[in-house]
Structure formats: C-alpha cells, structure tokens
Amino acid sequence: MRNIFQKVTALILFSGLFLFSSASKNEVEIGSSAYVVGKALYTKGVMPNGELVKATIHGDISVEGDQLICETCHRKSGMGSTEGQQVVPAIAGNLLFKPLQLPTSKPPEPPVYRPAYTKESLMAAIRDGVDANGKPLDPFMPRYNIDEASLDGLIAYVNTLSQTHSPGVTEETIHFSTIVLSSNSEMENRALLDVMDAYVEQKNIETRHESKRAENAPWHKEWMFKPYRKWKIHTWELKGEEETWKEQLEAYYSKQPVFAVINGFVPIGWVNVSEFCEANSIPCLFPTTQLPVISEQNYYSIYLDRGAVQEAEAAASYIKKELSHGGVIQIYDSTDQLSIVALDTLDRKLKNSGIRVKRYSLDQLSDISLRSISTVVDGTMVFWLDKAKTDKLLNSDVKLPDSLKILISSQFYGTDTHDIHEDIGKSVLFIHSSEIPSKLNRLLIRSTGWFRAKRIYNKQAREIQANAYFALKVVGDSVKHIRGYFYRDYLIEKIEHMIDDLPYTSIYPRLSMAPDQRFASRGFYMAKADGKGGIVNYTDWMSP
C-alpha cells in the first residue's frame, strides 16, 4: 500500500495535476533583460558572463556542458519528463510557485504536499539540492553554481513557460487541421479526408457522455474527465502558386486557430507550410510529403521520414559499404525538383569518400549513349527518374556492362517491376524506405480493417490512408496523456516520448524518436525484382 502511495505521489509531482492556489503574481515581459538571461541559462546552459554553467552531482562530481542544460530534462515546456523510473518534475512557473496539494473529497482545503517555491527556497534547491520542504532532492539533480542575477533570470524565464492553454482549445472543443493541395488528385484528397472525418466522428460518438462527466466529475476522477474536449478537424486546401501558400495558411489560421496540424498530403512544397508552422509555433505532425524540411532550427514539424533525401542518403550508405570499387553515375531529370534534391544529396554524401561521381541529365543523354557513359565508371548507375523515363532508358537496345549495378529509388519509380527486362533486372537494386509491399498487408491489418468497417478503404491510396490513421492515433494518444495541459510544446514532448512503444507503425517496419529528433523512420531496404512484377528485400532493414 505504501508503494502504491509513493507511485501516486510521484505521478502527482511530475504532472502537477492538483494545484489549487491562486496564480503566481510574477508577470514577466518577454524580451526583458531578465528573461534573456534566464532563457540563455535554461535553454543553453550559458551564464550572463558567456561562460557555461558549472555544477556538481552525487555530492562531489563536477560536471559542465550540455548535460546541465535545464531544458534537456525539464523540457521546452517546463512540464518535466520521465525516463524509466526517473521522474523529472514540472517547473513551469504557474506550477513551481504554487503549493502542491493532494486531492481530497473533504473541504475546505486539501493537504499541502509541498509549499510554493519562493526565490530563497528555489535558490536552495538549485544551489544546494534542498526542496521547499527542506528535504534533499534526487542526487541526479545538479547542484548549480549560479549567482543571484542568474536566478532572477531563471525565475523570469520559467514564469513564461506553459502559462495558458495554447490557441485552438476552448472549454468544449479542441481544433485541429489537415492540409491538402488542390493540385492533388481528387481521389488522393478524398482518401485522406475520409479517414479524418471517420476518425473524428467515431471519437466524438464514443465519448458522447464525457462532456457530462467533465462537468460533474467526482474529485478522485477529475484528472480523467476534466480534460475532455470534442474534436474538430478543419481542412485547409492550398491552391495556386507555392509562394501564396503561407498567406493562405495565415488566413485559415486567423479564421480559426488550431492546436495542431495533423498529417496532410503535400508531396512537394512543404517548406512553405513548415515556415508557417515555425512562425506560429504550431505542431505540424506527420505529413505525407517527399520534401520535408531538414533543419536543426525547426522544432514544430515532425515527419514520418526524410523523403527523397532519405533514399539518396540510403544510396550513399550502400554504395560506400558495398559498391565502392568503381565510380557512380547519376541520371536525373532537370525539370523535376525531387530528382535534383536526390541528386545533390548523393553528391554531397559521397563528396569526401574518394568515389568518383558524375551526373547526366535526360537532356544530355539525348546526345550521349547510355553504354558509353557506363563504361567510364565501371561501377554504379543511379536513376532519379520516374517509371516511364527509367523504363525507356533501360529497355532500349543499349547493352550495358554485366558488372554495372543499377540503383533505382522506389519513391520515383514505384514497385511495379513488370516492365524491367529479366537480363537487366539481375543488375537492378531498389532503394526502398518503407516496408516491402508484400509485407504491408500484415503491417496494416489494423488500419485496413478499420477502413473497411467504415467503408472508406481505397487500395490505390492505402499509404496515404495508413499515414493519416497513424497520425490521428498518435495525436489522440498524446492528447490523452497531456491530461488537460493543452500546451503545444508539451504535446510534442509526449509524442517524442511515446513513438518507440506504439503498436502501430503505419507503412514502416519500425519507428523511433528521441527528444528533438524530427524523423520517425530513418531506415531502408535494398530490394530486387521478385520475378513476379514486384520487389522483395535484398537486405535486412538498415540505417544510413
């Protein structure tokens, strides 16, 4: 019984669910000198003098650097984290500077577990490792060597963390959106939106009594029922030139703010959406796109994979390990943005490898024989072309050297190998960054069964539907776990924490994430034609 009480107490300390005192009186101007000092210390571990903060752990072990950054453990939201049995408590100002009280059914006041922190008690906690009750903090909590000015800055900064619910949340409803393009086929957009509509309809029907429970929740179940909100998903359809998309997104957002953007189908041009998401601090979660933005500066966009770049990185990795004996020729389409991105990525990844790399566009190949350029390198030829263009080149009368290896990206070509001649097929390997099609039925059995039950299954768009369903499930579970703390940063942190343990992985054999990672799948197969018009894996699932 004592162990159960200790576990419940730890959960309360972490989540801060039962805090009943008045709001903190510390109002901070974002951008003030104190705020700037505190932000540098909290997010980078940098003191006002520009030096890295220093501390000790376990009594006398000196440490410094990244491991002392407050944000690493307490996170961007200030809402804390867990790792195994280790609980890092929430330190956002509206929790830290209030008493922590345990729930009770007996008025007038619940018992105080921990008094509100003051400047003095917080200094004791940070410097000496003593909490507001005078008890020792966890030995893993660093004992920092900071001065009063740094503490004032830290107090100012944490007072700005997770203060009010993020936009898109009302007392009754939580608003989301999904993004599609008018240039997508009607079938593709409809397949995605059918999943969104069916999921939200079922979710709201299944929880139709939750509104009453939220209004009249018993004291010991308030944590469960009070956070309930109905879901509403808005469709943001982008039209016309990419340069106008951000303006269109701003107009949609001004009309109805959303808590997060879920999935969406934007094959190319996602950079415009990403810039909008970052500018407005909106989580944009698991879009289906071949051109995600790959930048350490981006925080709010989380992707399924790295798109065309991932297959180019996979090609580079495989060439270095298995095909480094010869040179590499890349064949690309100068009119195709994806083709150019993949081309440049492979060039960059092989730049210092000692492997000779040449490139030829389709325009150049009209004047040069495919065989003549293949004999120059005696190694590997990589095609960044769609199926029609690739087949036209490979199925010409040109005889290619038997020693030549041909790598084809399945994102460009697809997985239908009926048109690849058998004699050439022996030399062809496919770069494939999702599950092999023959194994997808097993992997997608849960989502496909649900689509069929809802009468929305579209075999032609099953990957689009599977990704949409995955994104909805992840967001649904994450919203449940934030338990009424509707802060966007906290939502992202929950997603980062739970991805590894999900039973459903969409079209990928495995997914994983860690704090500040933004791509759930980073692996690939090398595959070959199976002789039946499809592909089969040639290697195990690998990481670049």
Where are these regions (language model features)?
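C-terminal capping alpha-helices of c-type cytochrome domains
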Residues: 31, 37, 117-132, 142-167
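Detector for the c-type heme attachment site
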Residues: 43-46, 72-79, 96, 127-131, ...
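Hydrophobic h-region of N-terminal signal peptides that target proteins for export
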Residues: 12-22
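Bacterial N-terminal signal peptides that target proteins for export
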Residues: 1-9
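Short, solvent-exposed loop/turn and secondary-structure capping segments
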Residues: 52, 81-87, 102, 137, ...
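Gly/Gly-Pro-rich "capping" loops immediately C-terminal to redox-active cysteine motifs
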Residues: 54-121, 140-146
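Extracytosolic ligand-binding ectodomains
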Residues: 159-544
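Electrostatic cytochrome c docking/interface patches
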Residues: 25-64
